[in-house]
Design a protein with these regions (language model features):
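Functionally critical loop-and-helix segments that line ligand-binding/catalytic clefts
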Residues: 1-17, 136-216
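Glycine-rich, charge-decorated loop segments at or immediately adjacent to ligand/cofactor-binding or catalytic sites
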Residues: 70, 129-140
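Substrate-binding cleft of extracellular glycoside hydrolase catalytic domains
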Residues: 1-118, 141-142
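Sec/Tat-exported extracytoplasmic proteins
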Residues: 30, 48, 52, 79, ...
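Short beta-alpha junction loops
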Residues: 65, 93-95, 125-130, 151-152
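Aromatic-lined carbohydrate-recognition surfaces of secreted/lumenal glycan-active proteins
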Residues: 117-132, 144
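Structural signal for conserved beta-strand scaffold positions within catalytic alpha/beta enzyme cores
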Residues: 61, 90, 123, 147-149, ...
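C-terminal, disordered and strongly charge-biased linear tails with low hydrophobicity
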Residues: 215-223
Length: 223
């Protein structure tokens, strides 16, 4: 499987070259509404421009106060072209806001695609959220599961079979918040992705049958 990190305003990366040399892809926090209104993460564009296309890079939106349509429009309008290889909706209870329902989450996905985004789309959630609702409508729409399940959360993989709740399977597994990699002094979220998922998720044109290869091919990572 391939190794990836996700970073946001909390990660003040200085040595991007060393850090990128150890990972296969990067997910950046782009925007969200968990503070009460839509905002752009303060380090989003810095991270995206520093990475500069050297690795497959995606962006995520954190759910919160906004309605789904406005949130999708805000996300797309602020999407950095250096970080548009895949899109992720972060679905979680945070800062007093309940996690978005499957219907609201699907509305966000549909609006993102209506606005012209054709890359792979994922829904990020922990095991509890994955088990607490029926997410099959998102899966039928071609959305993949980015599952957070940390096990012992000690920097290593301690939950090799995390399950998938109401989903048929997961595509990416965030397995620790305590990862350590050269090039960054603090803890990092580490993720393992199944081989080829960033180029084999269904496209917006025909989720059931058309498999897109947007910009990158992650090769040699089967496992």
């Amino acid at each position: 499987m391939s190794l990836g990190i996700d970073i946001s305003t909390w990660q003040d990366v200085r040595d991007y070259g060393t850090l990128l040399g150890q990972v296969d892809y990067v997910l950046l926090k782009a925007s969200g509404s968990n503070t009460g209104s839509n905002y752009v993460d303060s380090k989003y564009h810095r991270h995206a421009n520093a990475i500069g296309g050297r690795k497959p890079t995606g962006s995520y939106y954190m759910n919160g106060a906004s309605d789904a349509t406005s949130a999708a429009r805000f996300f797309v309008s602020n999407l950095n072209s250096n970080a548009d290889d895949f899109a992720v909706l972060d679905i979680e209870t945070i800062d007093g806001y309940a996690y978005w329902s499957p219907a609201k989450s699907l509305e966000w996905v549909h609006e993102v695609r209506r606005l012209g985004y054709t890359g792979p789309v994922f829904a990020y959630m922990n095991t509890s959220v994955a088990q607490s609702a029926d997410w099959s409508a998102l899966e039928r729409a071609g959305v993949g599961l980015w599952l957070a399940n940390y096990g012992q959360d000690n920097g290593s993989l301690t939950s090799p079979s995390p399950g998938a709740g109401s989903w048929s399977t997961w595509q990416v597994h965030q397995y620790t918040q305590q990862g350590r990699l050269a090039g960054y002094a603090g803890p990092l979220d580490l993720n393992r992705a199944k081989a080829g998922i960033f180029t084999s998720m269904p496209s917006a044109n025909d989720p059931a049958t058309f498999w897109s290869a947007k910009r990158w091919i992650i090769s040699g990572l089967a496992g």
